Each structure stands twice: as C-alpha cells, then as structure tokens.
C-alpha cells in the first residue's frame, strides 16, 4: 500500500526538522513525513558540532549564507529562551596571531556591519577585560558580543517534540532507495512506498547521493570536511 503525504522531508537533522517546523506552522493540516536513515536524531553534523551560534560576520554581504546566518542566529536564540533550552551568551573575540593577519580584522568588521551584526574593534586593554589570557599581536581584536553557545542535542530534541505534538510523522532507520519522480513516489529499504506532493532533500553531506536517486544534479559531487574539537574541562 502506498501512503500519501503532502510533504516528505529526507533527513532529520537541524535543517530537515526546521523545514518541517516552519511548514507545519504555516499549514497545521499539512501531512508531513520526515525520513531519517539513522536510529535517532543528531548522529551526524547536526549533533556533532561546537554549538556556536554565529552572529553573521564571516560571509560576504548579499549572499544567502550572510542573510540566513544573521537572521537565523536571532531566531535560534529566541527559540532557546522561549523553550528554556541552554544558551550561553558569552560573546566571541577574534584576534590575529600574526601581523599579516591584521587586515582580516578589518575585513570581518566590515562584513559584520554590512550583514547587520553587532561587532566592535577593541584594544588589547579591552580584550584583557573580556579574557585576561588572550593576547593580540597587533594590539587590536574583533569583538562579537552576540555570539552564543547552545546545546545542539537539546534543540534537536525540542524541535522533534514540537513536531510530533503537531502531528508530523518521523520514521527512523529508513532511507529512500528508489524514486519515481514522474509519479511522485519513493520506496525505502523497508519496502515502504510513499507518495508525495512535494519532497525536500535535507540530507546534507549525503544530498548529492540522494539527488542522483531522483536523476537530479548528477554532475555534482559533495566534498565533505571533518572538523575535530577539543573538550575543555
């Protein structure tokens, strides 16, 4: 039997869950299915990151990344506060470790201002008041007071709770293995068949592989990079 949904979202990371959340807010009657290949949420990039909520100073102005980062950081901070989720509003300092890097401070400052972020160029004395152990070789640093640190797993679990309360269906341990775009249908590894009105690919680093199942973007291949973080006690 083919089950019918208005919207199918592939991937239950922060992107997939957030897309589902925004859609169900607009249309509470929308029949939404989220398909996740892992046994739970947060097993990849969405749950394995530093948790830094960037304020929007890194990306060139007039790019979608700049727009979404600046606006999204405010929305995410508000979401954490509204749901009593952990958020550390500690700010961030960026400082050059070499003389030749000083121009980057001016570049990031200009981008931050143009992107609508709150940024300030500070002296070594001001830096020492924020972080006594930090030193800048150029006597200048960039201060981003609105940068925060959040708990990615707490956010993912809260959005999942919100979605399930709103009637959104989430299937785990399931992945799409074949698709018929002309008929708007997909089949999964569990031999389930689903029909969709719209389908959104939110599988992040696997999005190129998934797209090829739908005969889309065959000329593209993602090149993923792995980040490693140290935990300080």
Where are these regions (language model features)?
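Short loop/edge segments at beta-strand edges and connector loops
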Residues: 36, 89, 123-124, 172-174
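Glycine-rich FAD pyrophosphate-binding loop
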Residues: 24-48
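Central helical "cap/lid" subdomain
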Residues: 192-233
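Gly/Ala-rich phosphate-binding loop of Rossmann-like dinucleotide-binding domains
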Residues: 20, 24, 162
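Helical element adjacent to the flavin cofactor pocket in flavoenzyme catalytic cores
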Residues: 141-198, 202-209
